[in-house]
Amino acid sequence: MPQMMPINWIFFLFFFICIFLIFNIMNYFIYEKKMHLINKFNQKKKLTFNWKW
């Protein structure tokens, strides 16, 4: 049914954005915890920016 196509695309876009945000939030918390444990071992007073890329 061609009339339903815009609704399907909107649902797909909304679903994709939700999954993307959930994975990013999970990745942030997992990576943040790991970096906190690593930074606890080498306590330095300088600012260290540790990025994933």
UniProtKB/Swiss-Prot annotation:
Q: Which residues cross the membrane?
A: 9-29
Q: Which UniProt keywords apply?
A: ATP synthesis, CF(0), Hydrogen ion transport, Ion transport, Membrane, Mitochondrion, Transmembrane, Transmembrane helix, Transport
Tell me any Pfam family this protein matches: ATP-synt_8
Care to name a GO molecular-function term for this sequence?
Answer: proton transmembrane transporter activity
Q: Which GO terms describe its cellular component?
A: mitochondrial membrane; proton-transporting ATP synthase complex
Q: Which GO terms describe its biological process?
A: proton motive force-driven ATP synthesis
How is it placed in the membrane, per its record?
Answer: Single-pass membrane protein
Q: Taxonomically, which superkingdom? A: Eukaryota
Record's subcellular location: Mitochondrion membrane
- InterPro entries this protein is in? ATP8_metazoa (IPR001421)
In the UniProt record, does the keyword Iron-sulfur occur?
Answer: no
Q: Which family does it belong to?
A: Belongs to the ATPase protein 8 family.
Describe, as the record does, how this protein assembles with itself and its partners: F-type ATPases have 2 components, CF(1) - the catalytic core - and CF(0) - the membrane proton channel.
Outline what the protein does.
Answer: Mitochondrial membrane ATP synthase (F(1)F(0) ATP synthase or Complex V) produces ATP from ADP in the presence of a proton gradient across the membrane which is generated by electron transport complexes of the respiratory chain. F-type ATPases consist of two structural domains, F(1) - containing the extramembraneous catalytic core and F(0) - containing the membrane proton channel, linked together by a central stalk and a peripheral stalk. During catalysis, ATP synthesis in the catalytic domain of F(1) is coupled via a rotary mechanism of the central stalk subunits to proton translocation.
Record's protein name = ATP synthase protein 8
Q: Which organism is it from?
A: Bombyx mori
